[in-house]
């Protein structure tokens, strides 16, 4: 049984349509979607939204407490990657995924970049954040530091891919222009 005090509000309003119709949005109470979160240990911090209008909720580096290590730190070696535990399980609602994104301060000040970042509805384990360090300097994080942000994204899995010999019968103004095709200025 989940302790109701450990539930948090994902947003102030419905992201996908703004409605509060219970038949259409059965997982919502009023306008706030409730998402269950489980702390795996007492030091785990719940995700927090710094401002009510922020899309993302901050995630924290929260390893399980160890008596033999009073202050836990983790280093990401130059050009290396490390997995950072959050100490949380988050139940992703039906029709959504949880996307783990860079925090601007972590990526711009420390150069740490989030790796594989999709948490599917079917995943039931602890949320880990994969941080990559493309710099030439070791980066160190302490337990309790902000490491990334989590964003709930509406998705559809009601898709069937159908193989075709040609998919674009009409020309578009972009065509097959890829990265950098519009120039720098």
Annotate the PLM regions.
Residues 2-10, 14-18, 26-185:
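DUTPase catalytic domain/fold
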Residues 22:
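Short functional micro-motifs and their immediate structural scaffolds
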């Amino acid at each position: 049984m989940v302790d109701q005090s450990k539930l948090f509000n994902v947003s102030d309003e419905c992201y996908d349509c703004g409605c509060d119709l219970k038949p259409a949005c059965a997982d919502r109470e009023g306008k706030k979607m409730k998402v269950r979160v489980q702390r795996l240990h007492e030091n785990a911090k719940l995700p927090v939204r710094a401002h009510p209008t922020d899309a993302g909720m901050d995630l924290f580096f929260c390893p399980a407490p160890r008596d033999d290590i009073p202050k836990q730190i983790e280093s990401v070696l130059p050009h290396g990657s490390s997995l950072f535990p959050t100490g949380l399980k988050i139940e992703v609602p039906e029709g959504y995924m949880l996307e783990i994104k860079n925090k601007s301060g972590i990526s711009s000040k420390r150069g740490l970049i989030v790796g594989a970042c999709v948490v599917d509805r079917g995943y039931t384990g602890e949320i880990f954040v994969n941080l990559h360090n493309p710099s030439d300097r070791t980066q160190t994080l302490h337990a309790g530091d902000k490491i990334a942000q989590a964003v709930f994204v509406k998705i559809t899995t009601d898709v069937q891919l159908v193989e075709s010999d040609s998919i674009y019968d009409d020309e578009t103004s972009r065509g097959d222009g890829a990265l950098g095709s519009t120039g720098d200025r």
